[in-house]
Curated annotation (Swiss-Prot):
This is Ribulose bisphosphate carboxylase large chain. NCBIfam families: PRK04208.1 (NF003252). It comes from Adenium obesum (Desert rose). It comes from the Eukaryota. It is an enzyme of class 4 (lyase). PROSITE patterns: RUBISCO_LARGE. Pfam families: RuBisCO_large, RuBisCO_large_N. The modification N6-carboxylysine is found at K192. The keyword Manganese does not apply. GO terms for biological process: photorespiration; reductive pentose-phosphate cycle. Its EC number is 4.1.1.39. One of its GO terms (cellular component) is chloroplast.
Length: 466
């Protein structure tokens, strides 16, 4: 018909296309959709595709000025979620032309920007994205990646060890630097600013950076190992963030840090570019992630936030522990840990991976395990996370009865014992406690740590299930 038909029509007439064959250049999304009572799943899935691409609530005559077929998102498959009533996985394909090159910000604004407040849905969760190689190639990704970081640090064949300096707020810069020095001298590779240490009245950023740099170089000179402290460059403005990163570089610090969700993807990508251009490693903290990813039926799964970070750029990112005080179920955690580190990841629904993902040689990100872990967890952590990880013990270092440096010694001895045992073919899952006990015979520091934390458990039911 020549005329334009005004009015409201069902989304599924335009946006539900089960016969569609996805293209290699499409961005694919898997949404967990909970429709309102009476809304059929096809309509709900189509509504998601429409509202996150070209659609609006009514027909508009300007639709005729473009080719909707070329630009619309399409819901191409719907399946019920096993064991859940009235919940569906809706698969949506987006043409690549809907997205600005090299902008995670634009990608997320399109895919999850508006549609989550949509009335026809009771709840909506983005479970996974398939990023096509054509789009990945528009991103720089991590400033350096796993191999380059190992070469810079000259550390191979084992996980790296870190420690978040506690109490996280309230120390003066001088005392803070002292704690950094003691931990690094004792045998850790890194120490870390807490995510909320920025520049507060009790410790301004410049003073902290100076004392931490002094601690790093003193510990390096004494141990003969390369050391680092994650200097948190997160700030209220991008200009201030740059100022902090520049000062870190001028001090000769090896690594800076950013809170990528509170700081935002635009700031994060800018900082990642600066870090690559200036030889700084970039540690990423995921503060605020649980606001977005903790609810099972609404929000975004962390694997999406992790993929977005690999595109935006970061050399380390916090990824749960499986064994500590914070959320993280084993198979699902390992699923997104692989998505961070590996170049090619096969679809595997049992691990929450909805799509095969090819990163086409984008550098990988080291997974950071942090939160309520101590020496007794070391065998499990070594087995679960493998070598390409950073194991961070805050209280598990600074809580040692003899002080910070002995706490660091205990962790390093425990780690080296676990790595050696693994390399000799022993089963860490079965013999873990025995390996730690053996090692503690030769290390009084480790023996004291074993005594303090022998009864600590964080046993709660996992929330992050399929």
């Amino acid at each position: 018909s020549v005329g334009f038909k005004a009015g409201v029509k069902e989304y599924k007439l335009t946006y539900y296309t089960p016969e569609y064959e996805t293209k290699d250049t499409d961005i694919l999304a898997a949404f967990r959709v909970t429709p309102q009572p009476g809304v059929p799943p096809e309509e709900a899935g189509a509504a998601v595709a429409a509202e996150s691409s070209t659609g609006t609530w009514t027909t508009v005559w300007t639709d005729g000025l473009t080719s909707l077929d070329r630009y619309k998102g399409r819901c191409y498959h719907i399946e019920p979620v096993p064991g859940e009533e009235d919940q569906y996985i809706a698969y949506v394909a987006y043409p690549l032309d809907l997205f600005e090159e090299g902008s995670v910000t634009n990608m997320l604004t399109s895919i999850v920007g508006n549609v989550f407040g949509f009335k026809a849905l009771r709840a909506l969760r983005l479970e996974d994205l398939r990023i096509p190689p054509a789009y990945i190639k528009t991103f720089q990704g991590p400033p350096h990646g796993i191999q380059v970081e190992r070469d810079k640090l000259n550390k191979y064949g084992r996980p790296l060890l870190g420690c978040t300096i506690k109490p996280k707020l309230g120390l003066s810069a001088k005392n803070y630097g002292r704690a950094v020095y003691e931990c690094l001298r004792g045998g850790l590779d890194f120490t870390k600013d807490d995510e909320n240490v920025n520049s507060q009245p009790f410790m301004r950023w410049r003073d902290r950076f100076l004392f931490c740099a002094e601690a790093i170089f003193k510990a390096q000179a004494e141990t003969g190992e390369i050391k680092g402290h994650y200097l948190n460059a997160t700030a209220g403005t991008c200009e201030e963030m740059y100022k902090r990163a520049v000062f870190a570089r001028e001090l000769g610090a090896p690594i800076v840090m950013h809170d990528y969700l509170t700081g935002g993807f635009t700031a994060n990508t800018s900082l990642a570019h600066y870090c690559r251009d200036n030889g700084l490693l970039l540690h990423i903290h995921r503060a605020m992630h649980a606001v977005i990813d903790r609810q099972k039926n609404h929000g975004m799964h962390f694997r999406v936030l992790a993929k977005a970070l690999r595109m935006s750029g970061g050399d380390h990112i916090h990824a749960g522990t499986v064994v500590g005080k914070l959320e993280g179920e084993r198979d699902i955690t390992l699923g997104f840990v692989d998505l961070l580190r590996d170049d090619f990841i096969e679809k595997d629904r049992s691990r929450g991976i909805y799509f095969t993902q090819d990163w086409v040689s984008l550098p990988g990100v080291l997974a950071v395990a942090s939160g309520g872990i101590h020496v007794w967890h070391m065998p499990a952590l070594t087995e679960i996370f493998g070598d390409d990880s950073v194991l961070q013990f805050g209280g598990g270092t600074l809580g040692h009865p003899w002080g910070n440096a002995p706490g660091a010694v205990a962790n390093r001895v425990a780690l080296e014992a676990c790595v050696q045992a693994r390399n000799e073919g022993r089963d860490l899952a079965v013999e873990g406690n025995e390996i730690i006990r053996e090692a503690s015979k030769w290390s009084p520091e480790l023996a004291a740590a074993c005594e303090v934390w022998k009864e600590i458990r964080f046993n709660f039911k996992a929330v992050d299930t399929l």
